[in-house]
């Protein structure tokens, strides 16, 4: 569900009944990778720019096994794992498109036309001891989009996930 936030921009809020990775002590990234495979072949549109974003076969592996993913822990790792359920909405509400040239030889074929980054936001429920939703934690993140030689833009990863302080929203 997409809702306006307390500060005026939109964010995606996950319903407490559909959190796939809740209550897990550590993230099983292979499960996240499997979950992401359902999106391969899907196409989404960013409302602000009307850019079309494709989901390619490289997303599940990159999202769950990137250097960024390997180095995150705790709340941020769980947030990234659960954000997979909100990918369509996170793409739709993305803002602040920026471009950067491809700098790595290993990406010269798949990101021949460089990279785009977009800001996005999502919120995840926090539960009390009874399993009821107590509040939502709000996160900001950057979508990393590769611009292929075909001219198509593909979601490659979600990076720079940060919990927004003092912006938790109440149910």
Q: What is each residue range found by the language model?
A:
Residues 1-13:
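Single conserved hydrophobic/aromatic residue that forms the stacking wall/gate
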Residues 5-8, 126, 157, 161:
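Generic detector of low-complexity/intrinsically disordered segments
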Residues 10, 15-16, 39-44, 50, ...:
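Extended interaction regions within the primary functional domain
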Residues 17-26:
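Acidic/negatively charged segments and metal-coordination signatures
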Residues 27, 132-171:
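A short, surface-exposed interaction/processing loop segment used at functional sites
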Residues 29-124:
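Compact soluble domain cores
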Residues 50-51, 104, 130-131, 150-151:
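Intrinsic-disorder/low-complexity loop/linker signature
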Residues 122-126, 145-147:
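Beta-strand elements of well-folded, non-transmembrane domains
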